[in-house]
Amino acid sequence: MTQTQTVLLYSDKAEIRDRMRLAVGTRPAPDLTLQFVDAASYRECISLVDTYELDLLLLDGEAQPAGGLGVARQLRDERDDCPPICVVIARAADRWLAAYSGADATLVHPLDPVTTGQTFAGLLQRTPAPS
């Protein structure tokens, strides 16, 4: 049975959100179908996290003025029910920052569709479906 999961894409740049959506695709695994909601600003991101039942957050670590690493850290500190977080970073050397932010996974620009799909499938399949 295929589950539909909701993923938040956060970046201040529409082209980055489009690249993230394209790399993930709508079916990262045979049993997963994704739908996306987009956030172009920090305020919109936080509002959508509060409004939607999200299954995964994909945050751009390079977003301005609030980067995905800071948003991830804030959500981890302030929410007990935070969904899994994947942060996209520009340099592999910054993985330690992503770990400190509380991100469950990191991806590095440019996004590889195979790695991105596998990462998403792993994060979503380990998360229990809402009852």
Where are these regions (language model features)?
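C-terminal output helix
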Residues: L111-F120
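Alpha4 helix (beta4-alpha4-beta5 surface) of REC/receiver domains from two-component response regulators
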Residues: A90-L107
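Conserved acidic segment of CheY-like receiver
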Residues: T4-G25, L57
